[in-house]
């Protein structure tokens, strides 16, 4: 019985599981259905073990509960959990469940999905009401629900088109033979293919062409292997192998890929809107030696006439890598503040990195954290320690009730606008959480000493070059101080928390905190974690949070919880401004708080190519549209050609940043003439399209409809596009077809059966569902085509403008690409670009028909902006100067 299970000791459970695990999984008895209660919008039932327990990877839980709810006509919620509700469930505080409208499935409306089940053994199926297509079917494979292992398998059509299940660096369309997607967030240097990376998104899209597209989301944060393969009978399947938690499924009816993404956003949350300036170009590097080198980069971009919106600083600014500190010799506060002021005076911005790990030594962030008791502790009450950049470290417990105040206070102190580093946005890293020390890491202090943590800072430069354009008080002062000796700070000995109780002794009584007695370090089932043991390179999974939850269950939530609290801390600093926070680690729903950069990639053509698929997965499936890769690659030495190509591609990432690693060749865009030219051209196009991007981005934050689109999202009935992940739509109007091979000046681009226009010439190209070879593509160019039927608003004066502030002052030109019927339409959204709450805006639709351009919509923002020109694409490109104010409805004849 489940109640009896809670009274057994860990040793007894382990011995029992191993003694009884004689049966293969295929012989597990499954469950039978009893006590079914039909409801207007679903049903409830009890599931009871249908035979002898098999106890293969834990102890079978005898009594389960089944609930189904037709939340809306397009969404079905199916939940299977233990009857006693002691098994861990993702807390509502971390993932708020959608509010279900009682009228969403009124009697006159018919749900688009159907739930059916078999009683003994229990299985269930989900089908599409309109065509009886079976979408999910567990028949023939018994449900296994054990203390540390949950298994559920669904059959699939042959050769299915599956997408999602991130984070990974595999093709967008998932492999379907002998393929395993492991979800266990880890520090994944070089983002190797076929492995678990920084995020966990148990959401997939199943695209079946004209039969429709649906989505399946499993709300479960435990480690898992999701296996896709064929069985011995050649039946295609997808199988969940989970280390715990419950089966909390949301099924989305679609029927289009865009519909599925919108429906997922209704559950996971709408993405956060970013400030307009955040869509500009960003520069960073790990390894800038001092604040003067950072300033020199700013100057060099200006000299090269490459627009730079935001300058970043990696952990180099810290005192021996300790968060919320400055290196007083290399990044003195007054000089950092002077640079920030210099940037702000020129409408540029500044960002630094913050890691979660706090140095276990005498420093303010550590001392204040101790006072509030916010750090993770072991079961004996002592502080849990790992080893990260500053050496021995402790980790904030995001579940602790004091942590929010602690984190907000640290930001308020260090990033104080009047006395600290007045950052404009935030970068958070290492929040899987990363830990350099392998389990069991019994002596993190010794590990840090042996592995040179923190690393020696660079020697203080005695004679940094003067900085043209900077004021005299900012210029370097000559110094012969070459003292870079390590400050070995005193390790503070902390007693166990007084009165601390081993969490896990009282986690019954339906509190959903996780079963007692589990093997939290070495569970019987081994997921394919590329780091090895669950606790390798991260926090130990047998430690507990202040609310009683085990790290074993919540590991995949750590980065997203840091994201949420960091966004709150940024809001506290600037309550009326939209925060921009970029994170490495994510879980489902993280897009409501943050954007994501795709991690520590490599300067290779393989990583360049796969960055497109990664970007599309996050933006179109996982609802994290502020996404992009490190342009030119993070680790390894880039090349001039690769960096040129990447500069042009990255300009069509929503998040556009150049970043690379200490010790590698410098790769700022001005380092090579050809790369500088590529960057200037690409940024000019990007900035001309910035309001088009901003409009599309805003729409996703309001409706959930994605704007960065795989081709199958735009042409769902074209079977030729299901595997294309080297082309994409930038908004629904612009097709981007980058060169993806080294040494090539051509690209084999697929054009669906539609009308397209070359962005550069305006000439038409009639797609016929075939591959067309585009030739003579220089290293500084990227092929772009506008889809027929679209109007694209572009800023008229973007060329040569250094900041997005300048861009916002220029007027508009409408690029009109008539469809096959001769008509076209497009949208434009303008607000103040930064306020959290907008009270005034221009939100309009442009239409073109029979030679007339019209505008209508919302005009509550007082503005002098106007449409100054139009360009009508076609065999004979037409350009006209017009005057169409954006202060009210109107139109002009061309």
UniProtKB/Swiss-Prot annotation:
Top-tier EC class: hydrolase
SUPFAM superfamilies recorded: (Trans)glycosidases, Galactose mutarotase-like, Glycosyl hydrolase domain
Major location (coarse): secreted
One GO MF term attached to the UniProt entry: glucosidase activity
EC annotation from Swiss-Prot or TrEMBL: 3.2.1.20, 3.2.1.21
Annotated compartments: Secreted
Catalysed reaction equations from the record: Hydrolysis of terminal, non-reducing (1->4)-linked alpha-D-glucose residues with release of alpha-D-glucose; Hydrolysis of terminal, non-reducing beta-D-glucosyl residues with release of beta-D-glucose
GO cellular component: extracellular region
A Gene Ontology biological process term: cell wall organization
A Pfam entry, by short name: Gal_mutarotas_2
Family matches, as CDD domains: GH31_MGAM_SI_GAA, GH31_N
Endpoints of the signal sequence: 1-21
Superkingdom of origin organism: Eukaryota
InterPro entries: Gal_mutarotase_sf_dom, Glyco_hydro_31_C, Glyco_hydro_31_N_dom, Glyco_hydro_31_TIM, Glyco_hydro_b, Glycoside_hydrolase_SF
Entry keyword Transmembrane: no
Glycosylation: residue positions: 137, 178, 300, 402, 482-483, 536, 601, 637, 802
Active-site annotation: 429 (nucleophile), 432, 600 (proton donor)
Family matches, as Gene3D superfamilies: Glycosidases, glycosyl hydrolase (family 31), Golgi alpha-mannosidase II
Role this protein plays: Glucosidase involved in the degradation of cellulosic biomass. Has both alpha- and beta-glucosidase activity.
Similarity section: Belongs to the glycosyl hydrolase 31 family.
Name of the protein: Alpha/beta-glucosidase agdC
């Amino acid at each position: 019985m489940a109640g009896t299970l809670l009274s057994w000791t860990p040793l007894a459970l382990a011995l029992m599981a191993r003694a009884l695990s004689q049966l293969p999984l295929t012989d597990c008895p499954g469950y039978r259905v009893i006590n079914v209660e039909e409801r207007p919008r679903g049903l409830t039932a009890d599931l009871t073990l249908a035979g002898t327990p098999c106890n293969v990877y834990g102890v079978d839980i005898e009594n389960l509960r089944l609930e189904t709810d037709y939340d809306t006509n397009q969404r079905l919620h199916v939940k299977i959990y233990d009857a006693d509700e002691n098994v861990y469930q993702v807390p509502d505080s971390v993932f708020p469940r959608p509010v279900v409208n009682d009228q969403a499935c009124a009697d006159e409306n018919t749900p688009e999905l159907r739930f059916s089940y078999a009683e003994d053994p229990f299985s269930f199926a989900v089908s599409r009401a309109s065509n009886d297509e079976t979408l999910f079917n567990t028949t023939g494979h018994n449900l296994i629900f054990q203390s540390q292992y949950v298994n559920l398998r669904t059959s699939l059509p042959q050769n299915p088109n599956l997408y999602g299940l991130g984070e990974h660096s595999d093709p967008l369309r998932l492999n379907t033979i002998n393929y395993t997607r492991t979800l266990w967030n880890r520090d994944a240097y070089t983002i190797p293919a076929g492995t678990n990376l920084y995020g966990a998104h148990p959401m997939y899209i199943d695209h079946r062409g004209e039969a429709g597209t649906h989505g399946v989301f499993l709300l479960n944060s435990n480690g898992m292997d999701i296996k896709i393969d064929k069985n011995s009978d050649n039946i295609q399947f997808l199988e969940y192998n989970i280390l715990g938690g419950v089966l909390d499924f949301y099924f989305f009816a679609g029927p289009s890929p865009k519909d599925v993404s919108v429906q997922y956003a209704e559950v996971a949350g709408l993405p956060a809107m970013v400030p307009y300036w955040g869509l500009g170009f960003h520069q960073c590097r790990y390894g800038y030696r001092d604040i003067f080198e950072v300033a020199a980069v700013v100057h060099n971009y200006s000299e090269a006439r490459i627009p730079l919106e935001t300058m970043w600083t990696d952990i180099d600014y810290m005192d021996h890598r300790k968060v919320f500190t400055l290196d007083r010799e290399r990044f003195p506060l007054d000089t950092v503040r002077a640079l920030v002021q210099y940037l702000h005076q020129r409408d540029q911005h500044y960002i630094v990195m913050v890691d979660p790990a706090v140095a276990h030594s005498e420093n303010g962030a550590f001392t204040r954290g101790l006072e509030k008791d916010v750090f993770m502790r072991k079961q004996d009450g002592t502080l849990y320690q790992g080893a990260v950049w500053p050496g021995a470290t402790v980790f904030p417990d995001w579940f602790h009730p004091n942590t929010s105040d602690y984190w907000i206070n640290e930001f308020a102190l260090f990033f104080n606008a009047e006395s600290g580093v007045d950052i404009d946005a935030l970068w958070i890293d290492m929040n899987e959480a990363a830990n350099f020390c392998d389990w069991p890491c019994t002596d993190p202090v010794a590990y840090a000493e042996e592995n040179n943590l923190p690393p020696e800072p660079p020697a203080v430069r005695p004679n940094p070059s003067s900085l043209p354009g900077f004021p005299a008080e900012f210029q370097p002062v000559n110094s012969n101080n070459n003292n870079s000796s390590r400050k070995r700070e005193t390790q503070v000995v902390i007693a166990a928390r007084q009165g601390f109780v081993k969490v896990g002794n009282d986690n019954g009584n339906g509190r959903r905190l996780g079963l007692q007695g589990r093997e939290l370090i070495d569970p019987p089932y081994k997921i394919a974690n590329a780091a090895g043991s669950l606790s390798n390179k991260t926090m130990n999974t047998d430690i507990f949070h202040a609310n009683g939850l085990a790290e074993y269950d919540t590991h995949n939530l750590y980065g997203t919880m840091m994201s949420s609290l960091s966004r709150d801390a940024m809001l506290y600093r600037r309550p009326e401004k939209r925060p921009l926070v970029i994170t490495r680690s994510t879980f489902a729903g993280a897009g409501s708080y943050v954007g994501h950069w795709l991690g520590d990639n490599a300067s290779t053509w393989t990583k360049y190519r796969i960055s497109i698929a990664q970007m599309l997965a996050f933006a179109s499936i996982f609802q994290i549209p502020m996404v992009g890769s490190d342009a030119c690659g993070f680790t390894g030495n880039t090349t001039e050609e690769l960096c040129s190509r990447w500069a042009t591609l990255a300009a069509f990432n929503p998040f556009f940043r150049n970043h690379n690693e200490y010790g590698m060749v410098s790769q700022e865009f001005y380092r090579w003439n050809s790369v500088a030219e590529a960057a200037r051209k690409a940024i000019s196009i990007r900035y001309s399209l910035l309001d088009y991007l901003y409009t599309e981005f805003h729409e996703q934050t309001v409706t959930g409809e994605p704007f960065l689109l795989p081709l199958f999202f735009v042409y769902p009935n074209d079977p030729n596009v299901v595997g294309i992940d080297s082309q994409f739509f930038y908004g629904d109007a612009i097709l981007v077809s980058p060169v993806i091979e080294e040494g090539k000046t051509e690209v084999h681009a697929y054009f669906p059966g539609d009308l397209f226009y070359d962005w550069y010439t305006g000439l038409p190209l009639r797609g016929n569902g075939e591959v067309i070879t585009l030739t003579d593509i220089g290293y500084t160019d990227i092929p772009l085509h506008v889809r027929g039927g679209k109007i694209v608003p572009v800023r008229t004066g973007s060329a040569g403008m250094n900041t997005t502030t300048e861009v916002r002052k220029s007027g508009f030109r409408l690029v009109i690409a008539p469809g096959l019927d001769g008509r076209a339409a497009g949208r434009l959204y303008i607000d103040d670009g930064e306020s959290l709450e907008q009270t005034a805006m221009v939100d309009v639709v442009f239409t073109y028909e029979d030679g007339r351009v019209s505008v209508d919509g919302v005009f509550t923002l007082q503005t002098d902006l106007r449409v100054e020109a139009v360009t009508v694409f076609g065999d004979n490109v037409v350009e006209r100067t017009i005057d169409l104010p954006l202060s009210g409805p109107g139109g002009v004849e061309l």
